[in-house]
Amino acid sequence: MDTPVYLYTDGACKGNPGAGGWGVLMRYGSREKELFGGEAQTTNNRMELTAVIEGLKSLKRRCTVIICTDSQYVKNGMENWIHGWKRNGWKTAAKQPVKNDDLWQELDALVGQHQVSWTWVKGHAGHAENERADDLANRGAAQFS
């Protein structure tokens, strides 16, 4: 079996909306890489999605990926809600446009290129890798605040 790539992702926002950042700690075996960035005007959910997108975009080949996020929004969106959104033309069950549909569609396309599983971790609870992703996201936000 392939050694999986772990992506520990997080988003941060100073105000919601406001300056925001995203962070990714990538781990493949004993190797690690850190990624982060931000935007001047965004939301926490957009940064959570962007973190996963940027992590997946950095992969150079198809692989097994375990995405560890503290965002129920991202995890539930990809595991539960997205199927209905796609079936309904990117509308919610209430027939409203899906928020952040641009990012959801990009994430959906990227996930399709890999063997992906999702793990939820409790945020701000001492999970070392999640704390590092949070620090990276805050560094990304600090560039714009």
Curated annotation (Swiss-Prot):
- Taken from the UniProt record, the cysteine pairs bridged by disulfide bonds within this chain are none
Entry keyword set: Cytoplasm, Endonuclease, Hydrolase, Magnesium, Metal-binding, Nuclease
Asked whether the UniProt record includes Magnesium among its keywords, one would answer: yes
Catalytic activities: Endonucleolytic cleavage to 5'-phosphomonoester
Q: What is its EC number?
A: 3.1.26.4
- Which residues are in coiled coils? none
Q: Where does Mg(2+) 2 bind?
A: 10, 134
Molecular functions per Gene Ontology: magnesium ion binding; nucleic acid binding; RNA-DNA hybrid ribonuclease activity
Q: Where in the cell is it found?
A: Cytoplasm
**Binding, Mg(2+) 1:** 10, 48, 70
| Residue ranges of every copy of the RNase H type-1 domain listed in the record | 1-142
Cellular component aspect of the GO annotation: cytoplasm
Q: Which InterPro entries match?
A: RNase_H, RNaseH-like_sf, RNaseH_domain, RNaseH_sf, RNaseHI
What is this enzyme's class at the first EC digit?
Answer: hydrolase
Q: Which Pfam family, giving just one, matches this sequence?
A: RNase_H
Main subcellular location: cytoplasm
The cofactor remark states: Binds 1 Mg(2+) ion per subunit. May bind a second metal ion at a regulatory site, or after substrate binding.
Q: Which GO terms describe its biological process?
A: DNA replication, removal of RNA primer
Q: Which residues cross the membrane?
A: none
* UniProt subunit comment: Monomer.
> Would you identify the family this protein belongs to, as annotated?
Belongs to the RNase H family.
- Stored NCBIfam families: PRK00203.1
Q: What does this protein do?
A: Endonuclease that specifically degrades the RNA of RNA-DNA hybrids.
Q: What is this protein called?
A: Ribonuclease H
What species was this sequence derived from?
Neisseria gonorrhoeae (strain ATCC 700825 / FA 1090)
Q: What is the lineage of its organism?
A: Bacteria, Pseudomonadati, Pseudomonadota, Betaproteobacteria, Neisseriales
Please state the gene responsible for encoding this protein: rnhA
